[in-house]
Amino acid sequence: MGGAMVEGLIKGDFIQNEDICVADPSRPMRDKFADMGVTATPSNQLAAQGADIVCVVVKPWLVEQVLTGIRDVMDYDQQMLVVVAAGVKSDSIKEWMTKEGKMIPTFLVIPNIAIAQLESMTFIAPVVADAQQVTQVKELFDTMGHSIITDEQHLGAGTTLASCGIAYAMRYIRAASEGGVELGFKADDAKQIVMQTMKGAVTLLEVTGLHPEAAIDLVTTPGGVTIKGLNEMEHNGFTSSVIKGLKAGAK
């Protein structure tokens, strides 16, 4: 996710490349980031010093180590902290980051990997922040897709719906593509057909504002092939499987 965010920041127009500093312990990764036109360092403290917004994007079990490692070099009056790590609680972050009774402005953020292509669905939960800071962080992530302000309670649901949801959507694309091959299309052609169909469905909903079921009604004629296909999917638990998968991912 960290690499995807860097790509999104570079492609977006919120921050200039020369103002982006990335910390990574891996030399090959630092070289990759440097080739993208940003500053790369092995030092978390160096990357955090002087930044307006410090984004910590690591595995959940590394968050405490990284935060306590940069806490003493951060300016609590000038900087903001964004933590991207599923399942990490605000109470833990407050425990790790409170310094002399003061807490740095902090946000819990869950994007998805489409952030690299400026198409993320991002959830932002303010932990400690005023209205201006919330607006600034939302503007940052809106340049890399779409973001909504939510509360910590809904981050788990947001993760499975949008972050895990990327994988669920890919699984449908794979299944439909395999079906296309069985129907006689070459694999690459089938994938392209399915991707364009998905894109068209999304655009139709965005432009018209229709409920998905109303859009389905536009293409289901009585006794036609579309309703037969839909009913066969439902007989095999299509909708139920999707909902059960989402609920399982949110546990």
Region spans (language model):
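Internal alpha-helical scaffold of NAD(P)-dependent oxidoreductase catalytic cores
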Residues: S92, W96-P105, M121-A157, Y168-T208
